[in-house]
């Protein structure tokens, strides 16, 4: 049976100079999404998408690699300055921010937007190893 020809949309190069880098760092993974000021995604990357699996996904090195690949893809759209929002308690927070800086993006502000409950849901029980 013949396969149908799938037409893929080519990425249109947008000329955006200012953006927002959303870094979500959990205990298991780090996801970096770079958007314009309105929240439209320009590029994204995560430790899992780069091939890190299991406990290696949560390392600072994996977060650094994810941040570098996302920033390189965003810089193709003309991105120069970025405002960073960090969410979550993971290990890759600082490493991801440093990688954005070393990739050549100018960081204008860093915000911590980690959601803090006003005593909402009961947290998971303590691990005993």
From Swiss-Prot:
Listed as disulfide-bonded, the cysteine pairs are none
Tell me the domain of life. Answer: Bacteria
Gene3D superfamilies, per the entry: Ribosomal protein S11 (3.30.420.80)
- MF terms per GO, please? rRNA binding; structural constituent of ribosome
InterPro entries in the record: Ribosomal_uS11, Ribosomal_uS11_bac-type, Ribosomal_uS11_CS, Ribosomal_uS11_sf
Q: Does the keyword ATP-binding apply?
A: no
Q: Does the keyword Ribosomal protein apply?
A: yes
Q: Which UniProt keywords apply?
A: Ribonucleoprotein, Ribosomal protein, RNA-binding, rRNA-binding
What's an example GO BP annotation here? Answer: translation
GO cellular component annotations, sorted alphabetically?
ribonucleoprotein complex; ribosome
Q: What does this protein do?
A: Located on the platform of the 30S subunit, it bridges several disparate RNA helices of the 16S rRNA. Forms part of the Shine-Dalgarno cleft in the 70S ribosome.
Give the protein family: Belongs to the universal ribosomal protein uS11 family.
Q: How does it assemble?
A: Part of the 30S ribosomal subunit. Interacts with proteins S7 and S18. Binds to IF-3.
Q: What is this protein called?
A: Small ribosomal subunit protein uS11
Question: Which species does the entry assign this protein to?
Answer: Macrococcus caseolyticus (strain JCSC5402)
Origin organism lineage: Bacteria, Bacillati, Bacillota, Bacilli, Bacillales
Q: Which gene encodes it?
A: rpsK
